[in-house]
Amino acid sequence: MTRIKRGYIARRRRTKIRLFASSFRGAHSRLTRTITQQKIRALASAYRDRGRQKRNFRQLWIARINAVIRSNNVDYSYSRFIHNLYKRQLLLNRKILAQIAILNRNCLYMISNEIIK
């Protein structure tokens, strides 16, 4: 069987990969084999970290809400606050509550005081 060099098709594939890795440092942006390895690794990391990002933001929102609620009332905590929210059927998600906690604490205090009653 004769050898096929692939010609312009291989060149087109390599340039496409090189464009992806153009911002990488050193050999990771120059050598085809290391570029392909780094591309696989970069895409795997991006996929993994998209899931982590959702987790981290949720943790941040919970920490912010908890800090503001505890500063208002020492006996009251985040878990009780969320439990009472669900009992009263107030559907506010954690992202919105965290923004209210940062931008307008008094509003969150009013919400928590209404729920406690």
UniProtKB/Swiss-Prot annotation:
Signal peptide: none annotated. Belongs to the bacterial ribosomal protein bL20 family. One of its GO terms (biological process) is translation. GO terms for cellular component: chloroplast; ribonucleoprotein complex; ribosome. GO terms for molecular function: rRNA binding; structural constituent of ribosome. Pfam families: Ribosomal_L20 (PF00453). This is Large ribosomal subunit protein bL20c. The gene is rpl20. It comes from the Eukaryota. It is found in: Plastid, Chloroplast. Gene3D superfamilies: 6.10.160.10, Ribosomal protein L20 (1.10.1900.20).
